[in-house]
Amino acid sequence: MKKLTKTNAHRQQKLASIINEVLIEILRRGKMLDIRLFNCPLAITKVIVTADLKIANCYFLPFNTKLTIDDIMDALNNSKNAIRNFVTNKINMKFSPEIRFHYDHGFDNAIKVEKLLKNISLKRRDKDK
């Protein structure tokens, strides 16, 4: 495994930023995508590139859609090669990273934490009465 240096970390961040921009552009235009994604607004929440620059883990969050997370994952994975080719054309590197999509559980986790905190607060209020 490649050692993480300051220069390499900068390259990771730069590549992640470029991939994020390209994904947003592709999703906005709807080019080269599985037909199920046309009426499925997605937010790319983050892109994390591995130290060796070979894998880009892309996290998404769907908005107001009838599709399940599994359907969205399947549609994104069907579009993966076209997306990778588009990324390759936008970056100036010998190799384009493999793109992997993941559902971003951060929003769901934040809602759960908020509910837990609210329950604790209510229990404290009830105890104080």
UniProtKB/Swiss-Prot annotation:
Subcellular location: Cytoplasm
Keyword hit for Cytoplasm: yes
GO cellular-component term (any): cytosol
Primary location: cytoplasm
Subunit text: Monomer. Binds 30S ribosomal subunits, but not 50S ribosomal subunits or 70S ribosomes.
Family as reported in the entry's similarity comment: Belongs to the RbfA family.
Protein name (database record): Ribosome-binding factor A
Gene name as annotated: rbfA
